[in-house]
Every structure is written in structure tokens, then in C-alpha cells.
Amino acid sequence: VDFNKYADCNEQAGREDTCYERKGSLCRDKRNCTKTRCLGCGSVCEVCCDVCPNRANVAIKVPGLAKHQVVHVDGMCNECGNCAVFCPYQEGRPYKDKLTLFWSEQDMENSENEGFLAVDEDHFKVRVAGTVRTVSVDAVNTGLPEAVRLTIKAVRDNYPYLLKK
């Protein structure tokens, strides 16, 4: 079975909803139902969210970005490695590679992950490419990659339960 054929088809614009509808679809006749099961990992994967026993990897909708983003919640992770084992990307390690939400200054200091920590309602301490800065994610000129800024803003605005109080 040529999974790349199905993945390429699924990655065409406007197919994300179709991919999500297929998630969890079971079929015993693998020869005849591949096209109804393949999500196309390049368009919808999120397997790291499904296999994490602690739900430390969370897929969120980010206004302004085409695809859901996976945020890794450091305080919920026990580094079991499930997400790395099941990641379809070669050498993928979502618990290390995904933007990480930290719950404490100490956790952020003890990690090498790129990520962010809420300082107050408007400001976040952010580490990207080894540089740490405190920014307001409402400001457009933060110096952060736009996808990072928008992801942090989405967590604050739409997923505040992820931020430890």
C-alpha cells in the first residue's frame, strides 16, 4: 500500500476536516480501506497527544495558523517516551521538540526545551533558539517567530486551564 499517495491527497488544501473525521477509524480489511483510514501525518498527526498517558501533549487551535499546534505541558510529563516511540517522524521527540509550557521558573531553568512561562496575565518568559526574553504576546514586535507568539496567545486566551495558577 502506498501511504504517501493517500498522505499527498490528504494534504491538499481544505482536507483537514476530512482527516479529523478519519481519526480513530477502525477497519479490518486493510487492503480495501486504507484511503478511509490514512490521516496524512503531514496534515493531521497528533499521535503524541493520543499516546501520552498523562495528556502532557495538547493539540490546540491557533487563530492565524492553518494547522493545530501541539503544546507540550512540562508539569504533566514524566518523560516516559511514548510520544517519541509512536512519532512517525524520524527521531521525533515531542516531549523535547514541541513548544513547552512551563509551570514554574525552576522547571524552565532545568530544561533545554524551547518554551514559555506565564509571568502575569500579559507577560510571558519565552525561550526560543537559546534566547530567553520576557514579552507581551499582544505586541506584534516581540522578536519571536509569529507562530510562537500566536501559540502562546492562544494558550492564554483559549486554553487558560493549561496555565497553572
PLM regions and their residue ranges:
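Ferredoxin-type iron-sulfur electron-transfer modules and their immediate structural context
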Residues: 1-76, 121, 128
